[in-house]
């Protein structure tokens, strides 16, 4: 559990009721004790305490689509911008690691003599 900056479509900070309505409109799953979901690609900050497990949008074609669920939604915090380094330090929660395996099919020195 920890504080995570997420994002939300409205320009002002949404209330919990609006968040739940947004979840229903988006047709996202709400499990027991889960207040709301959000996508990292939406546009305004929302802050909550999160359990950093990923769930899938049950209508999504791409099964790798990540959702982070917020267990304790915080509406009492003022709407301010967090420092960039704090935001970047949280990116690992919903970004998959890249470049662990080379994408090249072969390397020149292991290639057979025929071309």
Curated annotation (Swiss-Prot):
Domain of life assignment:
Eukaryota
Listed GO biological process terms: meiotic cell cycle
Q: What is this protein called?
A: Meiotically up-regulated gene 42 protein
Q: Give the record's keywords alphabetically.
A: Meiosis
According to its UniProt entry, the function of this protein is described as: Has a role in meiosis.
């Amino acid at each position: 559990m920890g504080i995570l900056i997420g994002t939300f479509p409205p320009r002002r900070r949404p209330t919990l009721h609006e968040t739940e309505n947004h979840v229903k409109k988006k047709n996202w799953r709400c499990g027991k004790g889960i207040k709301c979901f959000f996508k990292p690609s939406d546009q305004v900050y929302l802050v909550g305490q999160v359990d950093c497990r990923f769930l899938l949008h049950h209508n999504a074609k791409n099964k790798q689509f990540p959702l982070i669920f917020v267990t304790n939604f915080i509406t009492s915090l003022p709407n301010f911008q967090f420092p960039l380094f704090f935001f970047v330090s949280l990116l690992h929660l919903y970004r998959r690691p890249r470049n662990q395996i080379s994408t090249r099919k072969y390397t020149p020195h292991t290639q057979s003599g025929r071309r």
